[in-house]
């Protein structure tokens, strides 16, 4: 809700939208940000003047820079550096009215089976930002029946908790374009029965901001029937 901009950092020094300083990325390895005393920027609460260097692993973020109500999130995604500006006074945050949800539906709690892979697999996925490739670390498959229709979803997670990132028939109208649901794994992450409560299906941050880089479902990871349970699409004045 607080995100207000996303700027990919160029190799030639230049500005980023919504935050002071000049910024440049070198060979996808480091970011150099330069500030003057007039920029009124702090790092970890201390005034900054001169050059600040960031070096992150892919997928990492750093949010030590502040300017008034704004924070600069330096992030590395898909081998590229970006700055996302977060503002505690962002309009989306100011007018937030809460996440709409469906009423509790006991029929949305379904039994299923989990079958782990021999070894976890990393598969390429798309994300909420077309410029940012993603990877899903999938550990197995869950099978279940929802409203009379059989479904199979690949899941991520560990020996205690599994997560399915999924599509269903409500997406883009009643719900966000995709959602996720987490549930307990069988003991030790072994093959066995699971209970999936779709009343706990939730939106990713990308449902509330165009500046998200949230993971999308693996190809084909969907349920054909509408799942009218869990979190709904944010209201019209909370853009999806």
What is the meaning of each model-derived region?
Residues 8-11, 17-18, 110, 128-134, ...:
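C-terminal, non-catalytic interaction/recognition modules in large multi-subunit enzymes and RNPs
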Residues 17-19, 44, 66-68, 145-149, ...:
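Short strand-coil-strand connectors
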Residues 18-25, 70-76, 151-155:
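Broad, structure-driven detector of short, well-ordered beta-strand segments within folded domains
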Residues 68-136:
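Surface-exposed beta-loop interaction hotspot
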Residues 143-189:
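Acidic/His-leaning functional-site neighborhoods
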Residues 193-195, 199-240:
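Extended, aromatic/histidine-rich regions of cofactor-dependent oxidoreductases associated
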């Amino acid at each position: 809700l607080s995100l207000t901009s996303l700027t990919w950092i160029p190799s030639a020094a230049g500005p980023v939208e919504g935050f002071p300083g000049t910024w440049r990325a070198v060979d996808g390895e480091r970011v150099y940000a330069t500030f003057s005393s007039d920029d009124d920027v702090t790092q970890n609460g201390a005034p900054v003047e001169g050059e600040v260097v960031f070096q992150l692993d892919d997928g990492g973020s750093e949010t030590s820079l502040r300017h008034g109500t704004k924070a600069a999130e330096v992030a590395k995604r898909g081998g590229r550096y970006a700055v996302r500006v977060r503002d505690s006074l962002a309009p989306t945050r100011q007018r937030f009215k809460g996440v709409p949800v469906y009423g509790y539906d006991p029929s949305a709690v379904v039994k299923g089976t989990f079958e782990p892979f021999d070894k976890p697999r990393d598969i390429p996925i798309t994300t909420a930002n077309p410029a940012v490739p993603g990877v899903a670390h999938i550990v197995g498959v869950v099978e279940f029946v929802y409203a009379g229709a059989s479904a199979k979803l690949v899941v991520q997670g560990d020996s205690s908790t599994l997560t399915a990132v999924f599509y269903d028939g409500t997406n883009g109208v009643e719900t966000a374009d995709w959602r996720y649901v987490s549930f307990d794994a069988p003991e030790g992450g072994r093959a066995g029965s699971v209970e999936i409560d779709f009343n706990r299906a939730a939106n990713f941050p990308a449902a509330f901001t165009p500046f998200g880089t949230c993971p999308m479902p693996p190809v084909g990871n969907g349920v054909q029937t509408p799942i009218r349970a869990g979190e709904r699409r944010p209201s019209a004045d909370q853009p999806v």
